[in-house]
Amino acid sequence: MGLQARFLGLLALVIAGKCTHSPEPDQRWMLPPGWVSLGRVDPEEELSLTFALKQQNLDRLSELVQAVSDPSSPRYGKYLTLEDVAELVQPSPLTLRTVQKWLLAAGARDCHSVTTQDFLTCWLSVRQAELLLPGAEFHRYVGGPAKTHIIRSPHPYQLPQALAPHVDLVAGLHRFPPLSSPRQRPEPQGVGPVGLHLGVTPSVLRQRYNLTARDVGSGTTNNSQACAQFLEQYFHNSDLTEFMRLFGSSFAHQASVARVVGKQGRGRAGIEASLDVEYLMSAGANISTWVYSSPGRHEAQEPFLQWLLLLSNESSLPHVHTVSYGDDEDSLSSVYIQRVNTEFMKAAARGLTLLFASGDTGAGCWSVSGRHKFRPSFPASSPYVTTVGGTSFKNPFLVTNEVVDYISGGGFSNVFPQPSYQEEAVAQFLKSSSHLPPSSYFNASGRAYPDVAALSDGYWVVSNMVPIPWVSGTSASTPVFGGILSLINEHRLLNGRPPLGFLNPRLYQQHGAGLFDVTHGCHESCLNEEVEGQGFCSGPGWDPVTGWGTPNFPALLKTLLNP
């Protein structure tokens, strides 16, 4: 104990000096609505922090992602194993030694790494953590629909300058879990003709996207799919059973999820969690499904980052992952965004398809130095994920053509440059659109999203054994598109092909083949005189509202089955 105290005293002298740096200088602190501070945390209370160690060979990783994802490449579909990725990106021996010695001197204990060795999660007392990270001051907060308790620091932290070449950031200090939930809209007014429907169900989706009763998993492959849920969002298997009883009688399906990764709470089911599971398992019917449920349950952990760590630590994973998480780009530090983007790159190299909801605030809006601008969302803006926008039926009571759902998120990143795979499509949109917002509102050279879309308006969901109508949001369209990609993977696996992997390079090369082009409607944005609440508008081909369009399953299967 005396030796540890001397170590801490020496450490405090070193890091209290001027030789420190701020890893995340642009990380803004703001207490989100619905969260309340409960005051300082007891100095002897223990917390868990995750240290992101500097990775190697990221340029080479990017090259390999391009090679395995481009159908014109001889390496197409020859994905890396987790061990291959680890060998490529793992930190240098010097970084590993330096960080481990630093943490040991601080009294950190029970440290756990991942297979790729680029993240280290350790337990420390609050007192030790505040000495280790000058400036940090840990408080407990409560908020969210489940009154979740989390520990965060309202002040920026510093690291010793000597650690700058070795540590990208420390997670678990600033970012609050985003509150993402689908909207429940009022029932549309009016009465449709014979043949009407009263909301989106699996049978409506299967009719619109041309899925037959035969379009289900065979049960003979190792095909699998997953959704991830955060912030105490739980599903109940009894809800899934009731949902399939009501809406799944016309197609073969699985009665329960194959695996839950993380803690599945006993509280009330969340509408978003129920929506994710029910529509992933009805669109990707009869395919083994995993649920990542609120991973990282300790108060100081970031659930989204903990999900990424799970992906970095499992050698065998589902082929398709759908996620409804999102944050405003400007609310996150550039270091954090880039580090998370690298995790998406690692997943793409391994042949995983990651689909993210584009968000439910249209183009978004915020004010910078008194000037309004659109507000892009992340991870929707990552160049290594496939982002799913939202549509509505032109006639809400009929299975008709689709138009833009005005809440569908979309736009241009202020962080990521435009990837080469989409330059031609974006240039064509900017050249041909007759309803472009003023150029000062968006970064025309940034990564543009979404890439695709699906219906996002008027879903039926069963939650806590109650059928709930008119649930809406890209939280609905994302699992639907993910399930359809899982069906295509099923055919590829049966034909001896690899799974689709990172879809975007192929998607843009095929110029929307296999998709219904959505050409009518605009999404919402800033409510000012200059744009009057209108963001971007859809048009022929790709657009930043619905991407290339919505799935026409037989045509999309034909397009993506080979090679």
UniProtKB/Swiss-Prot annotation:
Residues 1-19 form the signal peptide. Binds 1 Ca(2+) ion per subunit. Residues 20-195 form a propeptide. Disulfide bonds join C111-C122, C365-C526, C522-C537. Optimum pH is 4. Unstable above pH 7. Coiled coil: none annotated. Its main location: other. Pfam families: Peptidase_S8, Pro-kuma_activ. SUPFAM superfamilies: Protease propeptides/inhibitors (SSF54897), Subtilisin-like (SSF52743). Monomer. Interacts with CLN5. Interacts with CLN3. Lysosomal serine protease with tripeptidyl-peptidase I activity. May act as a non-specific lysosomal peptidase which generates tripeptides from the breakdown products produced by lysosomal proteinases. Requires substrates with an unsubstituted N-terminus. This is Tripeptidyl-peptidase 1. It comes from Rattus norvegicus. The gene is Tpp1.
